[in-house]
């Protein structure tokens, strides 16, 4: 079925699927209102010009295989859709349906018809998660199937007043397919993305810190793509590198502050709790929310250069790590209206 501008269907895979090793794919599918969907197929060639064949001309190269393919997705930070990419990069996490008893990290009771998703650092060193994508260009009758799409980075930052999300990674297998004849369905337009204004000053941060002006974060997923004797010209396996996912924050402050500078110079560790709280409600008076908590340390400081002006701010990268007491480096909690991201485990 054609759709203006095309569409992309996303579904969770049990394990990253290659050409010849398909695992189960979720029947629960998602169509994201992307602003851009990227894909690319790097081709491997064998150039036999170096052989002694009695002539000096170049030989046409032979196609011998494919490197891991590039994929990406750009979209606004929608509260329901962020969870799918978290599932794909971090696994299922811990799901609890709102019941009038459980609370969110702010201590607010979550009613029925709300859902709490929690992803905690140090719990992902099991199987690698991935997505299957159908990419449809209806006007050109081009239909692309991608398997084994592993998110290697999720980056969230403000674009003006709107929070944007950029997801990038590689995948194992890309091919053309017949028209999948899908019928895209999207969240209602009434479900809006998180805004910069949905974030206030953090509930917990370094004492006496400067006033925060903007906040973005990056979640990196270190994986490696490899080949076995699978009978395929494509790579067919994805491994964790032995390092867990890493969360970093890019913080902009309105002014320079001696406490922030002292914390950087001393390598001071501190606890963080910050959140986006939407002005839209999931049900009743309970809004969409996104929380980041963890153990942080300033890793650098880029202050504004001294100029003939009253106020000077700065940019501070923040790194998260496991505390000496064993507390996980970070916890990400999403409160939204989705009760399932996958029909496969």
Regions found by a protein language model. Name each.
Residues 1-345:
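Signature of extracytoplasmic/envelope-associated structural regions
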């Amino acid at each position: 079925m054609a759709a203006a501008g095309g569409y992309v269907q996303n579904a969770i895979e049990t394990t990253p699927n290659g050409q010849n090793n398909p695992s189960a794919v979720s029947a629960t599918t998602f169509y994201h209102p992307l602003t851009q969907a990227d894909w690319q197929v790097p081709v491997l060639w064998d150039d036999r010009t170096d052989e002694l064949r009695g002539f000096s001309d170049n030989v046409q190269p032979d196609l011998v295989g494919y490197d891991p393919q590039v994929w990406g997705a750009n979209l606004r930070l929608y509260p329901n859709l962020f969870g799918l990419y978290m599932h794909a990069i971090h696994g299922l996490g811990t799901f609890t349906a709102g019941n009038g008893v459980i609370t969110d990290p702010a201590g607010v009771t979550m009613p029925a018809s709300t859902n709490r998703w929690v992803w905690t650092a140090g719990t992902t060193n099991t199987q690698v998660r991935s997505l299957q994508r159908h990419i449809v260009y209806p006007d050109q009758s081009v239909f692309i199937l991608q398997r084994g799409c592993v998110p290697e980075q999720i980056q969230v930052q403000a674009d003006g007043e709107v929070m944007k999300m950029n997801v990038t990674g590689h995948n194992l297998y890309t091919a053309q397919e017949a028209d999948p004849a899908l019928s895209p369905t999207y969240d209602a337009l009434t479900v809006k993305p998180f805004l910069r204004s949905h974030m206030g000053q953090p509930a917990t941060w370094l004492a006496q810190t400067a006033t925060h002006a903007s906040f973005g974060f990056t979640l990196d997923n270190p994986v490696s793509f490899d080949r076995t004797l699978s009978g395929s010209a494509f790579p067919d396996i994805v491994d964790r590198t032995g390092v867990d996912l890493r969360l970093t924050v890019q913080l902009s402050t309105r002014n320079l502050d001696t406490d922030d500078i002292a914390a950087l110079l001393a390598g001071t560790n501190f606890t963080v709790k910050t959140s986006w709280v939407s002005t839209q409600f999931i049900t009743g008076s309970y809004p969409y929310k996104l929380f980041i908590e963890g153990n942080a340390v300033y890793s650098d400081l880029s202050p504004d250069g001294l100029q003939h002006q009253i106020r000077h701010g700065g940019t501070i990268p923040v790194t998260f790590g496991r505390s000496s007491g064993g507390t996980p480096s970070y916890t990400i909690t999403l409160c939204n209206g989705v009760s399932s991201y996958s029909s496969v485990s």
